Each structure stands twice: as C-alpha cells, then as structure tokens.
UniProtKB/Swiss-Prot annotation:
Residues 144-146 are annotated as: Interaction with tRNA. This is tRNA-specific 2-thiouridylase MnmA. Belongs to the MnmA/TRMU family. It holds the Pfam family tRNA_Me_trans_C. It comes from Tropheryma whipplei (strain Twist) (Whipple's bacillus).
C-alpha cells in the first residue's frame, strides 16, 4: 500500500510513520505548513516542528516534503474559529482541522498523487466490517483516545485512514519505541493548546483580531453585575476571570451561562443552571444510519470527558441526544461524539440545549 504519512514534528506521527514502513508499505512523509508566519514558538505547525519532522523522516529512511496548506487552514480553521467565537459559540479547531485539512485537502491531494491512505499519529482504530462499512473505534488506550476529534469523518474518508497507534496500550510505550528507533522527538512534549495561538491566551488573541467590544455582564435575574471588553473572550462554564462587581446573593460562585452576541452580553449564574438534559443540532455519521427511532448509545461532549449513557434520534432533520444523566457547561458550537461501545456512530454539532424542569 502506498501511504502518505502526515508528520507534525511530534513523537506520535513519527512512530506511526515508522510502523507503516515496518508493515511493508511504501511510505512518504509530509509536513503540513499551516502557518503564514515565518516564525513561531509552539504548536504543531512551526518551523521547528517542520525541522523535527524532517529529521524523523530521515531517521526512518523515507522521502519527505513540506506542503503549504496555510491558505486552507486560515479559511477553514482560523477564520472559522474567529467567526464562531464572535457568534457566541465555542468551536473545536482540532476537529475542524481534521475535517477540512488532514482528511479533506490533504487526502484529496494524496489520492490524486496515487496514494492509498493517509497515515497519522492519532490514537483511534478503523475496522472494515463484513458489509463493507468502515467503522471508527476508540483506541485501545482510553487515556489517549482521540476518536472524539475524528468523529466528524465519514465513509469516504475512513476508507483511506491509517492509524498505526490505535492499538498501543500507552503513550509511554510510544516514547520508548521512538527512543529505541533513534528518533530525537522521543522526549518532545505533547501539544495541548490551540496551535495557532502562541500565547495560549485565547481571549487576548481574539481581541487583537476582533477588537474591543465593551458590554455588560448580567446575572440570571437580569441584574447588571459587571462589565467586559468582549463577550467573545468568555465561554459557557467559565468561572475564573469574571471580575464581577457584586457578589452572588447566596455567596456561591457564578459561572458563565450564556453569551448573547447580538446584545454583547455575558450571562452568569449558579452551576445548577449549567445543567443540560438535551442536545440537538446538525450531524454527520461515520456510517451509522440514525432514524426517528431512539437508539441506546453514549455521548461525549468534550475531548477528555467521560462518556454518558444516552439515547439518540432524528427529530425534524436534526439529531437529538438525551443523556441519561445531566451534562454540564455545554456550549453551542461544541461537538458531541456519539458511541455504541467503542464504535463511533457520528458527530453532533451542538446548536441547541435544553434543561428540563426539576421534578
């Protein structure tokens, strides 16, 4: 099989490429240049990362190239990130990158050049079912599982995905293997933050691009309790950094409950008001056919949160998910991954949430 290995400059993608070679595949390494800047200090798309990827490819013994996807990344990921926050929503840029860059733009180019699959260092597994369906499953290591950010992939993409690390029990073993292979990235730290925000201060980064927008912070009773310089700098569930001018009447902490972009208002209140009993919105599937008939499943609303048992069904052309127990601090724009056991059924882009009246 002819494999294009996407090499970020990290240890996971380097070991994945090496394993692809071990399996006898014809492997070519490629680093995606995603930043328009010639400098950078952190993330997965800096000049240093490109150098690390090139060194890893040389150590593995495979051809290596750098492909410029900065224009697509700007449009599909960065601009989307800014517009979503401007609209009071909370996007996941890693998911958008997988959807539009790694397994869309990159995959299309790979197929056009005669490659059979794109190999990445994601911790997930793909199986071919007897009926010809490609199933996306969690990784063997739930601690490192990344199926949440891959749940948006569909059959045409899964058919060409190759995840050599999916059955690896732990990241420690991957680092150990990299060290044994002589890969200098064996001890390189993981990247956890948004790769295109060097400071990791999302609010300040957004403010530089959107501009200052003064507004009010109100409580759930409509009373003004503070002010802000940009509602886009807040997200549902946030507790720290609110700088409220008056304490809560009950003395308990306040959390961001909602962001109203039209009035440029941030609404705060007690944690109980963050409870969500129903999620709904547009959806994609990995091959599963959702219908109006409810199915038992589980839902995961964040990359590193625990799944919650739920039911899912179609209502008025949108996917509705009702967790068996409430989930908290779910923002519009977030993604929810739907599972049956370890299998990923699909992805819900959360447009609406509901809280049922307490009994």
């Amino acid at each position: 099989m002819k494999v294009l290995a996407a090499m970020s400059g990290g240890v996971d993608s380097a070991v994945a490429a090496a394993r692809a070679v071990d399996m006898g595949h014809d492997v070519v390494g490629v680093h995606l240049a995603l930043s328009r800047s010639a400098s950078g200090k952190r993330g997965c798309c800096t000049p240093r990362d490109a150098q690390d990827a090139a060194q890893a490819a040389q150590a593995i013994g495979i051809p290596f190239y750098v492909w410029d996807f900065s224009e697509e990344f700007q449009e599909k990921v960065i601009d989307n990130f800014i517009s979503e926050y401007s609209a009071g929503r909370t996007p996941n840029p890693c998911l958008r990158c997988n959807e539009h860059i790694k397994f869309s733009s990159l995959l299309r180019r790979a197929l056009a050049l005669g490659f059979d699959a794109v190999c990445t260092g994601h911790y997930a597994r793909v199986f071919l079912d007897e009926d010809g369906t490609y199933q996306l499953h969690r990784a063997s290591s739930w601690a490192k599982d990344q199926s949440y950010v891959l749940a948006v992939l569909q059959q045409a993409q899964l058919k060409h995905c190759y995840f050599p690390l999916g059955a690896t029990p732990s990241k420690k073993l991957v680092r150990q293997e990299a060290d044994e292979r002589g890969l200098k990235v064996s001890k390189k730290p993981d990247s956890h933050d948004v790769c295109f925000i060097p400071s990791s201060n999302t609010g300040a980064w957004l403010s530089q691009r959107i501009g200052r927008r003064d507004g009010d912070i109100i409580d759930d009773l409509g009373q003004r309790v503070g002010s802000h310089t940009g509602a886009f700098a807040y997200t549902v569930g946030q507790r720290k950094g609110l700088r409220l001018s008056s304490p809560a009447w009950d003395g308990k902490p306040r959390y961001v409950l909602d962001i109203e972009p039209i009035s440029n208002t941030v609404v705060v209140g007690p944690r109980e008001s963050l409870r969500v009993d129903e999620l709904s919105g547009a959806f994609t599937t990995t091959g599963w056919c959702f219908t109006s008939r409810p199915i038992e499943c589980s839902v995961q609303v964040r990359a590193h949160s625990d799944p919650v048992s739920a039911i899912a069904f179609i209502r008025d052309d949108v996917l509705v998910v009702r967790p068996d127990e409430p989930v908290f601090a779910v923002a519009k724009g977030q993604s929810a991954a739907i599972y049956r056991g370890t299998r990923v059924l699909g992805q819900l882009m959360i447009d609406n949430t509901k809280k049922y009246a307490s009994s």
